């Protein structure tokens, strides 16, 4: 083989090698493009995933902030309710303490009243016994007084009748020689601060009544007043 043939063969071999290299380069370029494309897709996907994750985290953060705000408001509301409940509890406690004090005061008052009632019952019982004893003594004394009164009336010619708590009637007899049983009466009101003559029988003059009534209220001597009235009735019989 001559030189030209060897050169041509070498050229052909080089062309074949170039073509093979070109094919490899093309394949490498395609593979590189695919890798770049895949890499870009992966980067884009990661970027989207990252954005989505950031967005999700942002949303979660917003929701958590809302929840935190809501919890804070609930916490404040709960604290306010607790403070109000505590104040109410303190007020109720104070009221309960006041009621306990009032109850104790009532118990003490009740005990004092019961003690006073017992003392009063004892005093009433003692007073009742003394009153019964006094009534018995009074009844006995009244019986004696009736006897003495009858003697007194016969001796003095005067009967005393109590008509009410305010009126007393004094009746004189043994004044009229023609009729010793004839009665002469004067009714005296003793209910006020001063005595007043309500009526006389037989009737004395108004001037005479005013005169003896004035003397009675001035001197306050009933016995002297009765003596003067007896004298007036006796003079009345003589005239």
Curated annotation (Swiss-Prot):
<dbReference type="GO" id="GO:0031262">
    <property type="term" value="C:Ndc80 complex"/>
</dbReference>
<keyword id="KW-0131">Cell cycle</keyword>
<dbReference type="GO" id="GO:0005634">
    <property type="term" value="C:nucleus"/>
</dbReference>
<keyword id="KW-0995">Kinetochore</keyword>
<feature type="coiled-coil region">
    <location>
        <begin position="19"/>
        <end position="139"/>
    </location>
</feature>
<dbReference type="InterPro" id="IPR013255">
    <property type="entry name" value="Spc25_C"/>
</dbReference>
<dbReference type="GO" id="GO:0007059">
    <property type="term" value="P:chromosome segregation"/>
</dbReference>
<keyword id="KW-0498">Mitosis</keyword>
<comment type="function">
    <text>Acts as a component of the essential kinetochore-associated NDC80 complex, which is required for chromosome segregation and spindle checkpoint activity.</text>
</comment>
<dbReference type="Pfam" id="PF08234">
    <property type="entry name" value="Spindle_Spc25"/>
</dbReference>
<comment type="similarity">
    <text>Belongs to the SPC25 family.</text>
</comment>
<keyword id="KW-0137">Centromere</keyword>
<protein>
    <recommendedName>
        <fullName>Probable kinetochore protein SPC25</fullName>
    </recommendedName>
</protein>
<keyword id="KW-0132">Cell division</keyword>
<dbReference type="InterPro" id="IPR045143">
    <property type="entry name" value="Spc25"/>
</dbReference>
<dbReference type="GO" id="GO:0051301">
    <property type="term" value="P:cell division"/>
</dbReference>
<comment type="subunit">
    <text>Component of the NDC80 complex, which consists of NDC80, NUF2, SPC24 and SPC25.</text>
</comment>
<keyword id="KW-0158">Chromosome</keyword>
<keyword id="KW-0175">Coiled coil</keyword>
<keyword id="KW-0539">Nucleus</keyword>
């Amino acid at each position: 083989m001559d030189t030209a043939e060897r050169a041509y063969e070498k050229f052909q071999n080089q062309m074949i090698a170039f073509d093979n290299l070109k094919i490899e380069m093309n394949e490498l370029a395609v593979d590189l493009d695919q890798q770049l494309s895949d890499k870009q897709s992966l980067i884009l996907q990661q970027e989207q995933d990252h954005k989505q994750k950031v967005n999700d985290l942002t949303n979660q953060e917003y929701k958590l902030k809302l929840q935190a705000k809501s919890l804070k408001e609930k916490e404040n509301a709960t604290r306010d309710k607790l403070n109000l409940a505590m104040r109410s509890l303190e007020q109720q406690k104070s009221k309960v303490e006041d009621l306990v004090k009032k109850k104790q005061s009532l118990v003490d008052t009740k005990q004092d009243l019961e003690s006073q009632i017992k003392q009063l019952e004892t005093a009433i019982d003692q007073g009742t016994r003394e009153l019964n004893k006094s009534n018995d003594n009074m009844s006995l004394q009244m019986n004696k007084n009736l006897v003495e009164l009858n003697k007194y009336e016969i001796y003095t010619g005067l009967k005393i009748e109590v008509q009410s708590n305010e009126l007393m009637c004094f009746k004189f007899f043994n004044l009229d020689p023609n009729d010793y049983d004839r009665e002469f009466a004067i009714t005296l009101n003793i209910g006020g601060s001063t005595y007043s003559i309500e009526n006389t029988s037989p009737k004395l003059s108004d001037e005479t009544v005013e005169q003896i009534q004035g003397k009675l209220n001035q001197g306050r001597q009933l016995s002297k007043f009765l003596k003067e009235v007896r004298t007036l009735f006796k003079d009345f019989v003589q005239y």
